[in-house]
Amino acid sequence: MLIGVPKEIKNNENRVAITPAGVEAFVLAGHKVYIEKGAGLGSAITDEEYVAAGAEILATAKEVFDTAEMIIKVKEPLKSEFELFKEGQILFTYLHLAPEPQLTKALLDKKITGIAYETVQLADRSLPLLTPMSEIAGRMSIQLGAQYLEKQEGGKGVLLGGVPGVEPAEVVIVGGGIVGTNAAKIAVGMGAKVTILDVNTRRLAYLDDIFGNKVTTLMSNSFNIAKAVKKADLLVGCVLIPGAKAPKLVSEEMVKSMQPGSVIVDVAIDQGGSIETIDRITTHDNPTYEKFGVIHYAVANIPGAVARTSTYALTNDTLPYALQIANKGYKQAVIENPALLKGLNTLNGKVTYEAVAKAHDLPYTPAEKALNE
């Protein structure tokens, strides 16, 4: 198979979808890999390293898209990339289609086989290709929150861990999954007072076990969320429903109850956000805005700021799936691997992931049916 890896063009997105080790794995399996010039530089990987591993460097993204049967990316294509799609092409990347009607339409119009990292799901309901970036985003959310709590950043001037004789910051984490757990690890490590809310009592019990009395766990409901948000110095939104828009769990009234200079980091922004006052996606160049005196951070590609770590963490997990697709063809690969079948979001002009179809009021065709049509 002909594999194409274009350079990421999202604001300050420095990750790349393949490493030299990945190139070598494809080449040894009999495939050809084409990489856009400079695609790896943001992750400190040179074109020369790719060439040494067996890749061919192409000058432009257009050449990569024109040549490749399967495009492997990190982030969802932006509008300027839609025109590069080749009918029937395989696209393997984070898609986050639920809040992206234009991208969804473009994939359907060009009959793209869209396989989304974030909906590849194992039998135990875990999301293996979302996990590494969720771990990084969760950890970074606390670092970022601590930064924006500083006075020169517009925050209330609170040190997350406090000092002897002065109480630490209140960190409230809504959602106790992979993102929330990793956020809690860093917040606890920095000495903050941490509250985690989740709808799953078994998950709360697990969090109690691993953190002990270092965190407070609460059932996630509107009453408990409102009470926790009011006292939060740092609020982190970590809610995920695989493939679907994130539910708005924190209302505008709740945000209004927060003290001026408090900080919100919504890690769920790439699925539409879980905070009602998060009304826009921000960028690494311009990451925050203020609303009701509260600093809002809504960058959709948080791990892109630590690109080298993120690239290697991501590709460790995506490469085996990408090789399955290349070795067997997408159809056989998804038939043989139920986890990969869950990743299939679009096929032959049809939406094959129910949450995406619901988000855009489009007809839903089960993936198994679409494969046989």
Swiss-Prot record:
Its EC number is 1.4.1.1. One of its GO terms (biological process) is alanine catabolic process. GO terms for cellular component: cytosol; plasma membrane. Disruption phenotype: No growth on either stereoisoform of alanine. Pathway: Amino-acid degradation; L-alanine degradation via dehydrogenase pathway; NH(3) and pyruvate from L-alanine: step 1/1. The active site is at residues 96, 270. This is Alanine dehydrogenase. The gene is ald.
